[in-house]
């Protein structure tokens, strides 16, 4: 015993040293090695058993339990049965003897170790494992311990990790399911006993549900439940011990409910009991009582009581989240809704002492979250089922949800409730679409609730009604979606407004427009307060209170303009004529407001509080332009309705809008406002396309400004947008006009002069024999290239989907610039930033204008690129120029993707050199690099080469098909095909999951479209190599997220030759598997059933993978020299 005693002292001092602040990392590593070596010794567990019973040192106990955990989970198979019996007997005794004195984390770890033994040995070798747990629960002294054991068992056995065979996992689940009824009965008993013991009056269980009751239940869903008397009893004051037992019991239930099916085992009395405890979260009176009685030592604090409510709601939500509800359980579900709604009524009840909001503020935040989760689950999972019953009091439910939503104490809580309304509105919209006949009846049922919702959501986004809360919102920090808290708040609110608008357009419009009108009056009335001062114009509103009110009004106007813009889609299409007058009213107001802002230059005005009011004024102006832009599709429809008579009304709308835009296209205007004006101009040119646009003086003015070499250039983004608009005015066909009225000749001349002006400096860069390139600083040259190509690329990109005539004119104008680009390209091949921009330009040309460029010139471009991108140049770009260099190569490969997809024979002569470039030059450079750069583009190019040029590799003749039924095509260019397939195979051995997913999809597509897996060369030389690689990937768990896709791909490959798979491949695969013995291999083979349907086959694949890993784990854990029989 002395050696054990000595070892314990040594271990204690090592542990103390390890966790001491002064211990070096070097020494810590030495101690770690020492401890690991000790744990690996056979029989180390005996020392650990002694340590556990003899030490009070937490570190030593934790280490000893880790040794046991390792022994049981990794080495149990090799432990002699006598030792196993001893461990199974000693550890529970140790737990029983010390559970009251052990720190909770040590006790929980010891429970987990005992459950791990049960996971391996119950019921065969550890038959009393579960009986012991039940006995612990039933004995009052050990109830808490039994509940901890039960929860751990549910966690570890119902959803075990992968270190068990599939058969054992299934056996454990079945064993546990057999115990469910007993366990639920015990838990119900515990909760009821505690409740009854502490209740003022004795509770009687509710009547069991009888069939035929559901109609009454439905109509009374928001009335007091039959158990209301019970739910109205004062909540008992629990002592600490009882609260602890109840919280453990509820935690057990929540975990059990996460995996057991809904069935009669979940009795009405259990549900009612859970609801009793759910009241702990929402009964403020009881919390106050608890705090009054809190002076007595043994009473539970209000916070602890709140936690019981949270746990009970977790149980309810676990049941709610199950989509599949058996018929016999539906009644219970209705009872649950009834009882929860009863609690919701309690929470949202107004009385003198409490407003709803103050009551919600007093509740535990987690409890509110759980309640919101319940409502979300009710609407998303069960409303469809419940709402179809005519007895369901849907309006009362919405009233409750309304009160609950608009009294939320936090922004997050409010957002979550808006989500629920969004789900409800989506449900309603889809219901109406599927039952158009009942549309009126459905809408009438909900109309009042929806109008109320709309009004309240609109009030919530206005400072006029909600200033205190709105000012708390952060409008500076961007979240993951690149929006601020305020923007998110506004966006979510406007989504609800839009969804109501879709259902009730007239109501929504008549609610929103007057509110907008009020705020517009304030804005339009500012003109009278503008005075001229020495330095310009000043807004003569200085009183602090007036400034604050103006700030609020401007913020509200900005939000309401966004709301009006969001609703634009509900005025077009089939309803254009019916809602024309409303839309016209809106558009006229918007045109008036934008012109007003531009004319009196509110964006440049001096104000009393410049840091607040100036951004407000700029924002309103920008939002008015953006709202008008949202109506561009309506204007386009208006344009096509009036195109013959060009009614004055329409002409005025467009020309006034241009008068509002033109003054803003200036370097003196703030970017936010400038960009809003540019976007509106683009929409007029692209979406509306009125014939007379080009002749409006304001548009002429913009043309002159942009083509004037001496004018200051706008910021990049604005310059690109304005040039796009001007180009589109000249290039896009006018709607509803025949070809002979399109005035192409004059538009073509104008477009050529526009492009000529925009590319003047760029074309001058071209060296010529007469005037060799004049030296210009490199940075200046780069700037000209960047500025010109960004504009030209955008113009081409925006014309690429248009008519042939538009593209022809575009290319004629661009032709010289394109030739200059090709001439300049070799000079900049070592400047990767310039090459990147040039290749972007060429890629856009290839995608949009390759027909217009013509074959000879296109061939010249491709040949130039192929010559420039030598092996050395590619290596320099990929290996030494970082991300820009890689981007250059990726763009080049993208251009080649366009080339190989081109139908017809024109570019076929390039195929050999493109494949050679890929396989002999690019692939060797990137194959072994861990970085994913360039790989995705290269494999996409290889895939497109195969997909669009299948006959380059497989020549199929009609005669062959007729003669042999299924054509065994003639194979050509076999070495290239094999090399490409090998590259795909290699990519599956690399860690990059995105590349793996992409390439697996490519192979599957080639099989679906071209029967890749059936081709003789693939079938005979590659098929089972691919299956082998994919199986190994599953076994190594390196790409676990793609389990399902890999399983399907293995099935598709195996199904080409099932006989070969079962008879040859599978035995061969198992023979080659290391780490498993012959007997285990034969079990694995036997368990793989010869099913040929997809679900069974993939299930067999996953079973094989799981069990192979399990056997390896077991075998690794056996002591050296173990003889297995």
Curated annotation (Swiss-Prot):
Domain of life: Eukaryota
Sequence ranges assigned to domain Importin N-terminal in this UniProt record: 31-97
Binding partners and assembly: Found in a complex with XPO6, Ran, ACTB and PFN1. Interacts with ACTB. Interacts with ACTB in a RanGTP-dependent manner.
The entry's keywords: Acetylation, Cytoplasm, Nucleus, Phosphoprotein, Protein transport, Transport
Predominant location: nucleus
GO MF entries: nuclear export signal receptor activity; small GTPase binding
Role according to the record: Mediates the nuclear export of actin and profilin-actin complexes in somatic cells.
Modified residues (N-acetylalanine): 2
Keyword Protein biosynthesis: no
Modified residues (Phosphoserine): 199, 208, 224
Gene name of the record: XPO6
Full protein name: Exportin-6
GO cellular component, one term: nucleoplasm
Keyword Transferase: no
Family recorded in the similarity comment: Belongs to the exportin family.
Modified-residue entries (Phosphothreonine), positions: 201, 204
One GO-annotated biological process of the protein: protein export from nucleus
Cell location: Nucleus; Cytoplasm
Database matches in InterPro entries: ARM-like, ARM-type_fold, Exportin-1/Importin-b-like, Importin-beta_N, XPO6
């Amino acid at each position: 015993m002395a050696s054990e005693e000595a070892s314990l002292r040594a271990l204690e001092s090592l542990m103390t040293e390890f966790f001491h602040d002064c211990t070096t990392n070097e020494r810590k590593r030495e101690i770690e090695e020492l401890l690991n070596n000790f744990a690996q010794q056979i029989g180390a567990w005996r020392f650990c058993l002694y340590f556990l019973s003899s030490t009070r040192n937490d570190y030593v106990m934790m280490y000893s339990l880790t040794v046991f955990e390792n022994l049981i989970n990794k080495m149990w198979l090799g432990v002699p049965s006598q030792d196993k019996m001893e461990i199974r007997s000693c550890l529970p005794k140790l737990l029983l003897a010390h559970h009251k004195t052990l720190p909770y984390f040590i006790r929980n770890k010891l429970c987990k170790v005992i459950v791990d033994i049960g996971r391996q040995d119950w019921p065969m070798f550890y038959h009393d494992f579960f009986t012991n747990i039940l006995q612990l629960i039933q004995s009052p002294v050990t109830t808490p311990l039994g509940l901890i054991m039960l929860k751990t068992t549910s966690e570890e056995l119902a959803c075990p990790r992968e270190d068990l065979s599939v058969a054992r996992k299934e056996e454990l689940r079945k064993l546990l399911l057999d115990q469910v009824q007993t366990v639920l009965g015990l838990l119900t008993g515990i909760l009821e006993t505690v409740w009854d013991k502490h209740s003022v009056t004795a509770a009687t269980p509710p009547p069991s549900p009888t069939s035929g009751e559901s109609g009454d239940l439905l109509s009374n869903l928001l009335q007091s439940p039959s158990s209301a008397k019970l739910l109205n009893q004062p909540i008992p004051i629990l002592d600490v011990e009882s609260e602890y037992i109840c919280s453990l019991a509820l935690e057990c239930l929540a975990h059990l409910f996460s995996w057991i099916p809904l069935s009669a085992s979940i009795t009405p009395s259990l549900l009612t009991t859970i609801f009793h405890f759910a009241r702990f979260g929402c009964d403020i009176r009881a919390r106050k009582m608890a705090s009054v009685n809190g002076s007595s030592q043994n009473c539970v604090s209000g916070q602890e009581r709140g936690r019981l409510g949270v746990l009970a709601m977790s149980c309810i939500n676990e049941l709610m989240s199950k989509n599949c509800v058996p018929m016999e359980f539906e009644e219970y579900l209705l009872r649950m809704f009834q009882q929860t709604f009863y609690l919701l009524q309690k929470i949202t009840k107004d009385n003198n002492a409490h407003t709803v909001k103050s009551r919600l503020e007093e509740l535990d935040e987690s409890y509110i979250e759980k309640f919101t989760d319940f409502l979300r689950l009710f609407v998303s999972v069960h409303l469809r089922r419940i709402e179809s019953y005519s007895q369901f009091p849907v309006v009362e439910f919405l009233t409750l949800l309304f009160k609950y939503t608009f009294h939320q104490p936090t922004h997050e809580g409010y957002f979550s409730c808006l989500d629920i309304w969004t789900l409800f509105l989506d449900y309603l919209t889809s219901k109406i679409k599927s039952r158009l006949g009942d549309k009126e009846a459905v809408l009438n049922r909900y109309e009042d609730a929806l109008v109320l919702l709309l009004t309240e959501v609109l009030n919530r986004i206005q400072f006029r009604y909600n200033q205190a809360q709105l000012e708390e919102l952060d409008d500076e920090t961007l979240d993951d979606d690149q929006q601020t808290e305020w923007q998110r708040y506004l966006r979510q609110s406007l989504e609800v407004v839009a969804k109501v608008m879709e259902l009730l357009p007239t109501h929504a419009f008549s609610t929103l427009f007057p509110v907008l009108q009020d705020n517009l009056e304030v804005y339009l009335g500012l003109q009278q307060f503008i005075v001229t001062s020495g330095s310009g114009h000043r807004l003569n509103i200085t009183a602090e209170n007036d400034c604050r009110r103006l700030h609020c009004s401007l913020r509200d106007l900005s939000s309401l303009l966004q709301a009006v813009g969001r609703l634009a889609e509900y005025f077009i299409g089939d309803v254009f004529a019916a809602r024309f007058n409303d839309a016209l009213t809106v558009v006229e107001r918007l045109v008036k407001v934008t012109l007003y802002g531009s004319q009196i230059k509110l964006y440049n005005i001096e104000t009393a509080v410049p840091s607040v009011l100036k951004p407000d004024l700029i924002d309103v102006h920008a939002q008015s332009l953006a709202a008008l832009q949202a109506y561009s599709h309506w204007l386009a429809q208006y344009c096509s309705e009036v195109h013959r008579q060009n009614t004055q009304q329409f002409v005025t709308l467009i020309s006034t809008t241009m008068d509002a835009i033109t003054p803003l296209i200036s370097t003196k205007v703030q970017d936010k406002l400038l960009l809003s004006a540019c976007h509106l101009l683009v929409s007029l040119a692209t979406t509306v396309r009125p014939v007379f646009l080009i002749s409006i003086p304001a548009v002429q003015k913009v043309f002159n400004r942009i083509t004037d070499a001496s004018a200051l250039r706008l910021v990049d983004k604005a310059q690109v947008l304005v040039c796009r608009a001007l180009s589109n005015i000249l290039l896009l066909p006018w709607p509803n006009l025949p070809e002979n009225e399109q005035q192409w000749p004059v538009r073509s001349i104008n477009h050529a002069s526009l492009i000529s002006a925009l590319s003047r400096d760029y074309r001058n860069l071209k060296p010529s024999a007469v005037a060799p390139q004049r030296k210009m600083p490199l940075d200046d040259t780069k700037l000209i290239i960047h500025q010109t190509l960004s504009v030209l690329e955008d113009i081409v990109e925006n014309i690429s989907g248009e008519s042939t005539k538009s593209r022809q004119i575009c290319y004629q104008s661009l032709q010289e610039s394109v030739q200059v680009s090709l001439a300049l390209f070799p000079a900049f091949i070592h400047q990767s930033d310039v090459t990147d921009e040039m290749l972007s330009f060429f890629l856009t040309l290839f995608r949009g204008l390759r027909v217009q460029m013509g074959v000879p010139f296109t061939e010249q471009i491709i040949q130039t690129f192929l010559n420039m991108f030598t092996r050395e140049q590619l290596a320099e770009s990929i290996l030494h120029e970082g991300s820009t260099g890689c981007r250059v190569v990726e763009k080049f490969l993208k251009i080649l993707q366009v080339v190989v997809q081109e139908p017809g024979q024109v570019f076929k002569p390039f195929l050999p050199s493109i494949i050679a470039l890929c396989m002999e030059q690019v692939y060797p450079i990137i194959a072994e690099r861990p970085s994913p750069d360039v790989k995705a583009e290269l494999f996409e190019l290889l895939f497109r080469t195969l997909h669009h040029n299948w006959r380059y590799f497989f020549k199929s003749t009609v005669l062959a098909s007729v003669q042999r039924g299924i054509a065994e095509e003639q194979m050509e260019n076999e070495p290239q095909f094999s090399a490409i397939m090998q590259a795909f195979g290699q990519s599956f051995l690399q860690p990059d999951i995105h590349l793996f997913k992409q390439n697996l999809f490519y192979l599957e597509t080639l099989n679906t479209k071209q029967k890749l897996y059936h081709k003789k060369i693939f079938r005979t030389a590659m098929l089972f190599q691919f299956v082998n690689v994919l199986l190994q990937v599953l076994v190594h768990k390196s790409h676990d997220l793609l389990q399902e896709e890999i399983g399907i791909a293995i099935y598709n490959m195996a199904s080409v030759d099932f006989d070969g798979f079962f008879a040859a491949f599978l035995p061969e695969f198992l023979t080659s598997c290391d780490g498993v013995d012959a007997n285990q291999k034969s079990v694995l083979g036997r368990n793989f059933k010869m099913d040929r349907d997809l679900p069974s086959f993939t299930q067999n694949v996953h079973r094989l993978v799981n069990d192979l890993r399990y056997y390896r784990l077991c075998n690794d854990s056996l002591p050296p020299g173990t003889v297995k029989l």
